[in-house]
Amino acid sequence: MQIDATIDKNLAKVTEKVTRPQRSRSYNLCVKADALRFAKLYKEAVQAYLQAIMMDRKEPQAYFGLAMSYKYLQEYKKAISTLHKLIVIDDSKDDYFFELGVCYLSNGEPEKAIEHLIKAILINRENLEAQIQLAIAHELVDEADLSLMIYNKLIETNPEFLKAYYNKAAMLMGQGDFMEASRTFFQLIKRNPDYYKAYLGIAMSFDKMSKFKDAIRYYKKFLELNQFSEDAVFARKRIEELRVEHFSRDNSLSLVKSGDGIDF
């Protein structure tokens, strides 16, 4: 019986070693660094990731975590350099190329962002955020036609992806096409009536088209959903300006006040 018990104990130890392999010091440092990064202690995370890399220069997790820490510290050149080292080790993940593209965008280099965002999309065509960032990059290098094509394709294939509507409308406003921008914002609120930024976009578009009564109406709708923000301050001020300039005798266009209720 004693022999059987000893054998059972030895088997248990072997099984534990198989199911719970010893973790390397590098791995343990990565776990610690990840915890620091998730706690937004980015400088401390950088040090832990660097230590992990010194112990194992082929650990993708350490390079990715280090790059993300640099990104949140706005040290984009260091993040870019780290991500380039990472994709030499592992070029199979769309996240790596996506983050590289985003860092290039953040560093004011949209032309370099484009190729990496395209690679991210080729690896994972479901990466909708990569497609959004690619559209932004094309807009920044004066290729608005390509941006528009990307937004339209996103809206066609992923009609619930509201960011595509919003970014497309914002780009159209920047181009001075306020009519088409307002149409796109209307498509957005059809999908989500609580998307308050769309009401502000509609109001500003009508404002620019000198459709002041409609502008006031949508500034008010925006304020119904969002009363306490810098944009709300702007909307109230603009309603008052338009009321005084164009509708001073029309009491139905009174100012929407901040507070618990909304005064029409």
Region locations from a protein language model:
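Alpha-helical segment of the N-proximal tetratricopeptide repeat
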Residues: 22-55, 61, 65-74, 95, ...
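Start-of-helix register in tetratricopeptide repeats
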Residues: 27, 61, 95, 129, ...
